[in-house]
């Protein structure tokens, strides 16, 4: 496993980890991609609780979560990097079934809070990405419009219209 460290804060952040995965897939560095993804999926991913299906935005380099909230730009970049990996290298097993992992992330972003406690990252009233799930305002830097057309083709069928 491997992580990218924020050298100003001495932690690993979803923004840096997901950007690193995007760089790796674009440079055809599968081994490094898998190492970063495994670290993120092992230590940052939240399996249960209010933010189930999201990633803790900051972790110590030991893997301990600094915060249990997501920074939604990380979820977007994780999903797109995983879709690109699926198209470049094909899908593997478990967490390396890249396209399924990406679809799961997007599904959480749209559906969290519908059947159990939680909030979506994508605002259902205006379709804008939220700054954090529990707040109904956005951060323009989180808008990855260049991703949305591909998400509409590769997401779960029921999520494509979103």
Question: Over which residues does each language-model region extend?
Answer:
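N-terminal carbohydrate-binding/catalytic regions of secreted carbohydrate-active enzymes
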Residues: 1-75, 81, 88-91
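Extended ligand-binding clefts on enzyme/binding-domain cores
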Residues: 10-14, 49-52, 67-73, 96-162
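Sec/Tat-exported extracytoplasmic proteins
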Residues: 24-28, 44, 82-89, 106-113, ...
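Internal, well-ordered domain-core segments that constitute the primary functional module
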Residues: 76-106
């Amino acid at each position: 496993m491997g992580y990218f460290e924020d050298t100003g804060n001495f932690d690993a952040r979803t923004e840096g980890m997901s950007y690193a995965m995007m760089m790796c897939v674009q440079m055809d560095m599968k081994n490094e991609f898998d190492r970063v993804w495994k670290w993120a999926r092992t230590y940052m991913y939240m399996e249960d609780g209010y933010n189930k299906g999201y990633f803790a935005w900051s972790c110590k380099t030991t893997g301990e979560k600094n915060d249990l909230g997501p920074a939604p730009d990380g979820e977007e970049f994780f999903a797109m990097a995983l879709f690109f990996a699926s198209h470049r290298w094909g899908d593997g097993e478990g967490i390396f079934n890249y396209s399924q992992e990406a679809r799961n992330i997007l599904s959480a972003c749209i559906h969290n809070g519908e059947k159990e406690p939680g909030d979506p990252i994508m605002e259902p009233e205006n379709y804008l990405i939220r700054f954090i799930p529990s707040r109904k305002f956005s951060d323009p830097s989180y808008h990855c419009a260049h991703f949305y057309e591909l998400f509409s083709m590769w997401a779960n069928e029921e999520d494509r219209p979103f």
